UniProtKB/Swiss-Prot annotation:
Domain of life: Bacteria
One GO BP annotation of this record: proton motive force-driven plasma membrane ATP synthesis
Function: Produces ATP from ADP in the presence of a proton gradient across the membrane. The gamma chain is believed to be important in regulating ATPase activity and the flow of protons through the CF(0) complex.
Localization terms from the record: Cell membrane
Annotated HAMAP family: ATP_synth_gamma_bact (MF_00815)
Name the UniProt record assigns to this protein: ATP synthase gamma chain
Membrane topology, as annotated: Peripheral membrane protein
SUPFAM superfamilies given in the database record: ATP synthase (F1-ATPase), gamma subunit
Pfam families, per database record: ATP-synt
Length: 295
């Protein structure tokens, strides 16, 4: 490889480094934005959970179409809907791969309809022949409460109409700076699982809510519970979308930071090689001049 080739390669790597560095900075900004969004929604979401938790703990037996019925024989051929949240783009490490892999393991041979948020997951599952809702077209970028409300309404409609017996979510959970793919059944609610989620949220908020155990719910605890579940689901889906959004950009930050570091190392090695060749060339010229002068 000559000096000219090395110089061109150094220039090319520097251009790539500019791109990876810019992508890192953009993802860092979006990651911080997502963390702020999550912190703002948590208090409201926590209060809705607190009321539901109180109804379940202190009002006796609650009957609701949204609660799992333990005494009813389990259906053999359940119709399941899976809300799968991936990214719209790649270049974010194993983020998309991990969500897709967990989804495949969960679905297996189930009779399932997939509602996929994010272009990467949508393209993959359509290509592999899964039953993907083609009209469910939502981006993973910049999640909003209105978007979460739309998705919650679609899922509730299918559940209430009997088109779905179970609704699941597969997404990447963000806790601090750690990530893990989580599979969660949204409906029907499992009381034990719901209490566990409520306990996790209680740890995450600063201001705890205490409800009088003698609280009377009108017209009835069951009706109040049924009225609150859609709000709970909207808050939960918003939390899922924001955590996935934060996870995607954190993964991209890590990937782009690694790519930038690799580019720096390559530039350093190529520059060293270029200087060696340049030095050798200069030395050769000096030798030729001295040799010529002595003749």
């Amino acid at each position: 490889m000559g000096k000219r080739d090395i110089a061109l390669r150094i220039k090319s790597v520097k251009e790539v480094r500019k791109i990876t560095r810019a992508m890192y900075l953009i993802s860092a900004s979006k990651f911080q934005k997502a963390k702020g969004m999550l912190d703002r929604v948590r208090p409201y979401y926590y209060r809705v959970q607190t009321v539901m938790k109180d109804i379940l703990l202190h009002t006796g037996e609650v009957t609701s179409r949204y609660l799992e019925k333990k005494d009813v024989p389990e259906k053999q051929d359940k119709r399941k809907v899976f809300l799968i949240v991936t990214g719209d783009k790649g270049l974010c490490g194993a983020y998309n791969h991990n969500v897709i892999k967990a989804s495949i393991e969960l679905i297996k041979n189930e009779k399932a309809n997939l509602k996929v948020v994010g272009e990467v997951g949508r393209r993959y599952f359509i290509k592999k022949g899964y039953d993907v809702d083609r009209d469910f077209l939502y981006t993973a970028q910049n999640p909003t409460v209105d978007l979460a409300a739309e998705i919650a309404e679609i899922l509730l409609k299918e559940y209430n109409n009997g088109d779905a017996d179970e609704i699941w979510a597969v997404y990447t959970e963000m806790k601090g700076l750690s990530q893990k793919v989580r599979t969660l059944r949204l409906l029907p609610l499992d009381v034990e699982n719901f209490m566990s989620i409520a306990a996790e949220e209680e740890e995450a908020v600063e201001e705890h809510v205490v409800i009088d155990s003698d609280m009377i719910y009108e017209p009835s605890p069951s009706e109040v519970f049924d009225a609150i579940v859609p709000e709970y689901l909207k808050g939960l889906i918003y939390s899922i979308l924001v955590q996935a959004f934060a996870s995607e950009h954190f993964s991209r930050m890590v990937a782009m930071d690694g790519a930038t570091s690799n580019a720096d190392e390559m530039i350093e090695k190529l520059t060293l090689l270029y200087n060696k060749l340049r030095q050798a060339s200069i030395t050769q010229e000096i030798i030729e001049i001295i040799t010529g002068a002595s003749v």
